[in-house]
Amino acid sequence: MKVEFAPLNIPLARRLQTAAVLHWLLSFLLFAQVCLGIIVFLIIYNYWFLYLPYLTWLYFDWQTPEQGGRRSEWVRNWAIWRYFKDYFPIHLIKTWDLDPSHNYIFGFHPHGVLVVGAFGNFCTNYSAFKELFPGFTSYLHVLPYWFRCPLFREYLMSSGPVSVSKKSVCHVLSKEGGGNISVIVLGGAEESLDAHPGKFTLFIRQRKGFVKIALTHGAYLVPVFSFGENELFKQVSNPEGSWLRNVQEKLQKIMGFALPLFHARGIFQYNFGLIPYRKPIHTVVGRPIPVRQTLNPTSEQIEELHQTYMEELRKLFEEHKGKYGIPENETLIFR
């Protein structure tokens, strides 16, 4: 295979964009382990005056990811996020005005390999979120285990993510007067194993917990589809029933997160590596589904609203797929 190297005369801005994406990628693939290693090092070599105050503070701060987190506008305004957004680039599209007197659940689809669109749009101040949705604060919910790693949790929370636990979602949606948006990647870890280019398989049929929470809090549901999310990486073929898929699913059940074997391009060449491809991401926010607060919803009410949500999600995909190069015969597959 002939290696295609990047030309030397690439503009500085594009180099900075690649560096920004590399920083983000390494943050999620390696930084947690580095932070854990730092704590272990401090304990082994008895730097008690460093680790003891932090671990004491950590004990009292443990619930913060379930209580709205601790975002930093300074971190969200870092210039590196502008280069990160422009690398793909990432776009946020609004199709309907939202009433800031309500709280909302944005159901984000698809998961993709690393949920790039969700981070770029809802965890930095360089997306069009503030202009499109004035009066709102968004909270991207991520797996709780990210917040169990000392030091890394502080870095992660500074961009705005909070835990995806029920307690955390309920906390966000309990704001009096509205104006909060819980962004939940509903397909979760399982869906990442089906994040192949040109494929649109969503794990949604058994995901009904978010519907019950929406009913109990009267939070409006909004389907969100991120066109281009599955085009950023290629995965090793892992069809249902294959030995690789079986291993991945078993590991996912044990660890709580999936391990897709993905690849894309490198820093200085285009043939192999872990840097995502430069593919545009268009995150389209659909029409809100009004939800009447029901403190003790029945299974029938949950099922009915869940069905309505899936219909609105499919409608959103069908209405916009042609704008983003998806063939007319392609459709969503709900699992």
Swiss-Prot record:
Coiled coil: none annotated. It catalyses: a 2-acylglycerol + an acyl-CoA = a 1,2-diacylglycerol + CoA; 2-(9Z-octadecenoyl)-glycerol + butanoyl-CoA = 1-butanoyl-2-(9Z-octadecenoyl)-glycerol + CoA; 2-(9Z-octadecenoyl)-glycerol + octanoyl-CoA = 1-octanoyl-2-(9Z-octadecenoyl)-glycerol + CoA; 2-(9Z-octadecenoyl)-glycerol + dodecanoyl-CoA = 1-dodecanoyl-2-(9Z-octadecenoyl)-glycerol + CoA. It is a multi-pass membrane protein. Pfam families: DAGAT. Keywords: Acyltransferase, Endoplasmic reticulum, Glycerol metabolism, Glycoprotein, Lipid biosynthesis, Lipid metabolism, Membrane, Transferase, Transmembrane, Transmembrane helix. GO terms for cellular component: endoplasmic reticulum membrane. Glycans are attached at residues 125, 180. One of its GO terms (molecular function) is 2-acylglycerol O-acyltransferase activity. The chain crosses the membrane at residues 24-44, 104-124. One of its GO terms (biological process) is glycerol metabolic process. Pathway: Glycerolipid metabolism; triacylglycerol biosynthesis. It is an enzyme of class 2 (transferase). InterPro entries: DAGAT (IPR007130). It is found in: Endoplasmic reticulum membrane. Its main location: endoplasmic reticulum. Belongs to the diacylglycerol acyltransferase family. PANTHER family: 2-ACYLGLYCEROL O-ACYLTRANSFERASE 1 (PTHR12317:SF26), DIACYLGLYCEROL O-ACYLTRANSFERASE (PTHR12317). Involved in glycerolipid synthesis and lipid metabolism. Catalyzes the formation of diacylglycerol, the precursor of triacylglycerol, by transferring the acyl chain of a fatty acyl-CoA to a monoacylglycerol, mainly at the sn-1 or sn-3 positions. It uses both sn-2-monoacylglycerol (2-acylglycerol) and sn-1-monoacylglycerol (1-acyl-sn-glycerol) equally well as substrates, and uses sn-3-monoacylglycerol (3-acyl-sn-glycerol) with lower efficiency. Probably not involved in absorption of dietary fat in the small intestine. This is 2-acylglycerol O-acyltransferase 1.
